[in-house]
Amino acid sequence: MTGVASFGGTAAYIGKVSSDSLGDVFGHDLRAVGVQFRPGRPDGDTPTGRCIIVVTPDAERTMNTYLGVSSLLCPADIDEATVAAGKVLYMEGYLYDRPEAKEAFRHAAAVAHAHGRQVSLTLSDSFCVDRHRADFRSLVTDEVDILFGNHDELLSLYEVGSFDEAVAAVQRDCHLAVV
């Protein structure tokens, strides 16, 4: 979202942060670059999520992620006016673990499509795909116009042995895949 806003585009963030220092900094920094940010701030003690990313010189990444309160995304968090006003809805696969989050994804996608908008999904990592393969396949086939994934994520999604087979499968399922 910050990249889109930094290049002059309009961007909005739908999600959750806590009323803690990381949530405050996250919100401040998004707003500072022009991202519309009205997050859900749930009651309770679950802190704002965080992630440490290590990138090696050969461009491999290792991530240590705690999703925190962001994992509590639910349909009530989806601002329909924001989704309807956007051109592309971008959904983060890491948030797909809970049943309420799955409902939120489907709801947001339905709102986007009802307003003629495109829906995109990032597969996030192959372990995430392994956990949600059947649901992701259904989501990709039924709701997703643009799919973001890497080599390993696509192989996992389609349970095939070669990248060429994965590419052929994704071409059948969605309009555009960004690998």
Model segments located where?
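Glycine-rich phosphate/adenosyl-contacting loop at the front of the ribokinase-like
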Residues: 1-16, 20-25, 32, 51
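Ribokinase/PfkB-type carbohydrate-kinase core domain
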Residues: 18, 24-42, 55-179
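Short, glycine-/polar-rich solvent-exposed loops and beta-turns at beta-strand/coil boundaries
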Residues: 44-46
